[in-house]
């Protein structure tokens, strides 16, 4: 099983980059210390997504960072990514594991305790859980699950849980106190005019996680 060796999990959305090149924004975040990126550009055609994934792979390699691909196991394999991130109702993690093997990471998005338990049973390496706080990017998932549900989930499962949704500096300590291994976020870095400095500020509040732990 691959090791979850990061505490800040950056998820991309080029539509929130304010017209800037996504690779340039992510490069800034990597320069600021981000060590895991999920490429999540669901509206791109497969060929365009593959080209972007390969470019993102070269970029993350420069910084010794991990790259996960949202949903697309085929793109992850073709781009040489470190794994995939699956939706709660998408491909079962067990099926993805058969295709990817034991050496790649599998994350699963969960929006409730039942989904979290199912992800563990399917062999996920980690989950994102949320939205914990209000956020426009996750409005489709309804009302925030709240900090109490996050705390209950971290007590019930044995894999790392990343708090997702409305994450900012002010609420990171609360999420960590609830048992989160780290935080996952999009706009806090992608939409920031200085992704490097924003990444540094966020990482200063998070526990270090290394591959040598």
UniProtKB/Swiss-Prot annotation:
Chain sites annotated for binding Mg(2+): 71
Keyword line: Magnesium, Metal-binding, Thiamine biosynthesis, Transferase
Iron is among the record's keywords: no
Cofactor note: Binds 1 Mg(2+) ion per subunit.
Necessary cofactors: Mg(2+)
Pathway connected to this protein: Cofactor biosynthesis; thiamine diphosphate biosynthesis; thiamine phosphate from 4-amino-2-methyl-5-diphosphomethylpyrimidine and 4-methyl-5-(2-phosphoethyl)-thiazole: step 1/1
A UniProt-annotated Pfam family: TMP-TENI
Gene Ontology terms, MF aspect: magnesium ion binding; thiamine-phosphate diphosphorylase activity
Record EC number: 2.5.1.3
GO CC field: cytoplasm
Residues reported in the UniProt entry to bind 2-[(2R,5Z)-2-carboxy-4-methylthiazol-5(2H)-ylidene]ethyl phosphate: 135-137, 166, 186-187
Protein family: Belongs to the thiamine-phosphate synthase family.
Purpose: Condenses 4-methyl-5-(beta-hydroxyethyl)thiazole monophosphate (THZ-P) and 2-methyl-4-amino-5-hydroxymethyl pyrimidine pyrophosphate (HMP-PP) to form thiamine monophosphate (TMP).
Protein's UniProt name: Putative thiamine-phosphate synthase
Lineage: Bacteria, Pseudomonadati, Thermodesulfobacteriota, Desulfuromonadia, Geobacterales
Chain's gene name: thiE
């Amino acid at each position: 099983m691959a090791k979850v060796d990061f505490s800040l999990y950056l998820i991309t959305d080029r539509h929130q980059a304010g017209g800037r090149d996504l690779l340039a924004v992510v490069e800034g975040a990597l320069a600021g210390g981000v060590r895991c990126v999920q490429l999540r550009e669901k509206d791109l055609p497969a060929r365009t997504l593959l080209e972007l994934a390969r470019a993102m792979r070269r970029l993350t390699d420069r910084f010794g960072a991990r790259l996960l691909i949202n949903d697309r196991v085929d793109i992850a394999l073709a781009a040489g990514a470190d794994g995939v991130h699956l939706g709660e109702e998408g491909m079962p993690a067990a099926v993805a594991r058969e295709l990817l093997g034991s050496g790649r990471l599998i994350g699963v998005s969960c929006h409730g305790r039942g989904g979290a338990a199912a992800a563990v049973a399917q062999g996920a390496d980690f989950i994102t859980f949320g939205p914990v706080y209000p956020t426009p990017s996750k409005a489709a998932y309804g009302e925030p699950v709240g900090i109490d549900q996050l705390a209950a989930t971290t007590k019930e499962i044995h894999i790392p849980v990343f708090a997702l949704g409305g994450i900012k500096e002010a609420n990171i300590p609360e999420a960590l106190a609830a048992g989160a291994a780290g935080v996952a976020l999009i706009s806090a870095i992608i939409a920031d005019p200085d992704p490097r400095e924003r990444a540094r500020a966020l990482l200063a509040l998070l526990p270090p996680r290394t591959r040598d732990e």
